[in-house]
A protein has these predicted regions:
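Hydrophobic ligand-binding cavity/cleft-lining segments
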Residues: 2, 6-68
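Hydrophobic-ligand binding "helix-grip"
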Residues: 2-19, 23-24, 78, 83-125, ...
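N-terminal targeting or signal-anchor segments and their processing/structural boundaries
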Residues: 28, 34, 166-173
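Extracytoplasmic/periplasmic, Sec-exported soluble proteins
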Residues: 36, 46, 88, 145-152
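Extracytoplasmic/periplasmic/luminal assembly and interaction segments
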Residues: 41, 51-101, 138
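Hydrophobic pocket/interface hotspot
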Residues: 43-54, 82, 96, 104-106, ...
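Amphipathic, soluble alpha-helical interaction motifs
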Residues: 57, 163-166
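Beta-strand/loop substructures that line and gate deep hydrophobic ligand-binding cavities in soluble
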Residues: 107-155, 160-162, 171-173
């Protein structure tokens, strides 16, 4: 009985410490990465606003070639939705909730995403971000989210750059 009381005591102390620790951590997070892509904005927009194209550049399909992806809603742009199932990267969904040639906003199961396209002298500056708020007992995860998400964003943007720069630009007469 004494051993059981010790286990209960240390379990309670651990739970209180963990809960107290979460009181001092912001539950809000934001991860953002940018890249310069040497093509006109419309080429980047066409690749990002068409969710079917993501498997050509986003890192998650490279991590799991068996990932199952389904698309509903619009073909591209506002209202386009993507659902995925994967033993490696998990299950989730994404929906484009705002869309224009300057960027778009997405809704995910665990946060919000946004894209910003800014024309530059040499092409397009592309920014990709995700933000959200963790549940109280998961607040500690905000300390690690940058390390978890940022490398995937960087690899995805690098893949997007390679893909977009391989597409010939249309000439306007």
């Amino acid at each position: 009985m004494k051993a059981l009381m010790q286990i209960l005591k240390w379990t309670l102390i651990t739970m209180l410490a963990f809960t107290s620790f979460n009181l001092f951590i912001s539950p809000e997070y934001k991860v953002e990465r940018s890249i310069e892509i040497n093509v006109p904005t419309y080429i980047v927009y066409e690749q990002v606003s068409d969710l079917h194209q993501w498997e050509n550049w986003a890192v998650w399909w490279k991590k799991d070639s068996l990932m199952i992806t389904n698309y509903t809603g619009e073909e591209r742009g506002l209202g386009a939705k993507m659902f995925w199932t994967s033993d490696v990267v998990g299950d989730g969904h994404l929906e484009i909730i705002e869309c224009s040639s300057q960027g778009m906003k997405t809704k995910l199961a665990w946060g919000n995403g946004s894209w910003h396209f800014e024309e530059t002298e040499n092409g397009t500056n592309v920014s990709w971000s995700m933000n959200g708020k963790m549940p109280f007992l998961m607040s500690f995860m905000t300390m690690f989210i940058e390390d978890i998400v940022a490398p995937d964003f960087e690899k995805g943007l690098t893949g997007l750059k390679a893909l977009c720069e391989s597409i010939p630009a249309k000439t306007i007469d």
